């Protein structure tokens, strides 16, 4: 069996962890530069706010209705996500993190039985005076309680509510988690372990919400009169093969209980990107753009080292807004290949800056007398690392002028200090100190778990 743990309204739940006064109140989280709504609590959904609502259009309404508004705090969200995933690893030996707020895990009765035997003395109320063997004889008791226990423990330990779905396939597990989230009667876990339960769940589930069914496929199925997952699952395999591709066929098989997507370890990324859109009118100062690109390159190298990889390809891009008719348009997009694969930030930052400087536009003079010096307003920039390979073993070069052993120790020391004291404690001079390219985040919460200056203070008597 496969389980899926899905954090409920994750970004909003993260903001509530350190703000218990927001429990039961509407909460929304905004996108980069406070552009639009990207997360809503159940209370905010009930007030009619939609995903993607432009903030400037709903700001006054939110303030009038007492909605708690937050800018995106990805440092906090990432930290709490790591805590949730760490908790899940105590319940299953195989974890497959799908996103920041979702993770698949291996789940079966033997695993649940072992867990409960080890913790029976600590949790006697879980069994209601029944033995574990007696629970195992009931068709759903053990696995359902196992999933409910995971949900309750994560909420108690981390403060994040999660919904658990357990089924024979990943697709069915995702459907189960949706039901667990929607209906409180499931007590945090929906178990789909029989054909009867599977068909009942599929008959209530819209086809457009099935994992793996995109908008175009959903429209095609709707045109064919198929509006629920059950109607699609009941079709013959030959019919599915004749109308759809192999990906949709795999989804059909998963809906019918045939596992086609197994639990896997998190695969190594084929490319790593860090980018950002800039607030207001954008950036016109070349020095600020260089600071931004340097910081993006450093972020990429941190991710690279974290997954134990090196890279040989680097791409830098930056562009102006296409929608501002009063300033000139310009696009930077270029790449280079390093002679030796590396994950050292001084090498990658240097290469990224060389790309930017080579392609940066020269000062231009406009022909109009009222605009003798027009500048470029860059609205977005980023760095991409590619040709990624494992750090061990790494291809060596007989004539490499760099002491790689010494360089590796330096990177390990920098990473350790920055992990302990916060991002940017040790940085290259080109990164700057005041983050002149930072996002517009007027509703930013504190970094309660990663910045020692933001740790909550508790008064004792």
What name fits each language-model region?
Residues 1-256, 263, 404-461:
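Gly/Gly-Pro- and Ser/Thr-rich, intrinsically disordered tail segments characteristic of DNA damage-repair
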Residues 23-25, 160, 312, 330-334, ...:
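A generic structural signal for short beta-strands and their flanking turns/coil linkers
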Residues 98-102, 167-170, 309-313, 376-380:
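Short Gly/Ser/Thr- and Asp/Glu-enriched loop/turn motifs at secondary-structure junctions
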Residues 103, 310-324, 381-393:
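Core structural elements
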Residues 120-125, 331-334, 397-403:
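Short intrinsically disordered coil segments
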Residues 337-461:
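Acidic, metal-coordinating catalytic segment for phosphate/diphosphate chemistry
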